[in-house]
Amino acid sequence: MEPTSGFAEQPGPVKAESEEQEPAQWQALPVLSEQQSGAVELILAYAAPVLDKRQTSRLLREVSAVYPLPAQPHLKRVRPSRSAGGAQSSDLLLCLAGPSAGPRSLAELLPRPAVDPRGLGTPFLVPVPARPPLTRSQFEEARAHWPTSFHEDKQVTSALAGQLFSTQERAAMQTHMERAVCAAQRAAAQGLRAVGAVVVDPASDRVLATGHDCSSVASPLLHAVMVCIDLVAQGQGRGSCDLRSHPACSFTQATATQGARAGSVRKLDEDSLPYVCTGYDLYVTREPCVMCAMALVHARIQRVFYGAPSPDGALGTLFRVHARPDLNHRFQVFRGILEDQCRQLDPDP
């Protein structure tokens, strides 16, 4: 089917400064990878109390040479502790233990003459974090078991605390999601599934495409996300969907700068289109499915904001496609913008 010209976007009314309002109560929460959001995995290790602190440096050097722990560089080898009498003491991490490990003596664990065990007490088993903590909550959980180094991602910490976006950014995000909600309502009026989506260029805050679910028995793949990606392509002189029967689906013609950028990005292969959504944001009322999530990977979207989760969602519920390390593109995902409104549009079955 030949691409159509679509319906040109008209700029919406500009609010007077006195009409600026605080965004409604919602949180844009990051949807992190399974490694970032999961519980701390623990493995067993052997440690021993340091009975003579004057031997600590030597013991640390000798034990580290025999058991360097290259896969666990986050683990600190010495843990402050207190003796039975309350005096300050320390424990030395010796080596990892198997899952069915039992009590072992110093002679069994530390080979002579590489390690002189003088100054060490009886070894004991202790759970330690298997991998470096990636978030502050993981760090707090990890260090409750054993001292652990932590290289904090300030952006993730701010996002988890709800402090990543300014009031002005939140207001713009709410406006874009409200536009997606309106598109979903227009879809419902046509007897279609009430899911709406908007693609925005964050560099200019310009709306590039507005769409809604157009799927039917004849066209089962026209989910809101797929429609929006095609509309962005139509704005760049590409695209393949005839959406003239859906007046709420519209796009903005690409500017010369956008067109040059779209035409200059490298192609997937000789017969494929350029990446049409490089650097863009998507707002969608419902969490995308696997098909739509993979389409966003191929389109090179930058960020996705969705209102309500979906039972078959692929950006947080069933899968986290956006964070898979084996894919050649990853993007940020946030959930919860106007969640109540979005959930009411298309209630869960």
UniProtKB/Swiss-Prot annotation:
Region (Disordered): 1-25
Domain of life assignment: Eukaryota
GO molecular-function term, one example from the UniProt record: catalytic activity
InterPro entries linked: CMP_dCMP_dom (IPR002125), Cytidine_deaminase-like (IPR016193)
Location of the CMP/dCMP-type deaminase domain: 171-334
Cofactor(s) recorded in Swiss-Prot or TrEMBL: Zn(2+)
PROSITE patterns: CYT_DCMP_DEAMINASES_2 (PS51747)
Keywords: Acetylation, Metal-binding, tRNA processing, Zinc
Modified positions (N-acetylmethionine) in chain numbering: 1
Family: Belongs to the cytidine and deoxycytidylate deaminase family. ADAT3 subfamily.
Protein name: Probable inactive tRNA-specific adenosine deaminase-like protein 3
Source organism (scientific name): Mus musculus (Mouse)
